[in-house]
A protein has these predicted regions:
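Coiled-coil-like amphipathic alpha-helices with heptad-repeat character
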Residues: 1-3, 23, 41-44, 51
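N-terminal acidic leader/helix
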Residues: 1-32, 56-60
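Short, charged, amphipathic alpha-helical segments
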Residues: 9, 16, 35-46
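Amphipathic alpha-helical coiled-coil segments
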Residues: 46-63
């Protein structure tokens, strides 16, 4: 497996985890667990920024 394929797999994993975190956050908001949700959303945002950076790098490599 080449580096590009590995980066895509890692990016897909992070995006999947982010989606799961957002679903959990939605449930916690319904239970008024605002501080927990805030921390989880900050972690999710960092993960998504990492994915965005990796995808930009991947795009640059494939051009």
């Amino acid at each position: 497996m080449d580096a590009t394929a590995r980066q895509r797999i890692v990016a897909a994993g992070i995006i999947t985890k982010a989606a799961e975190t957002l679903q959990i956050a939605n449930m916690r908001l319904a239970n008024h667990e605002y501080l927990v949700v805030s921390a989880e959303l900050m972690d999710t945002a960092r993960s998504l920024k990492t994915v965005a950076r990796q995808l930009r790098e991947l795009h640059d490599l494939t051009e």
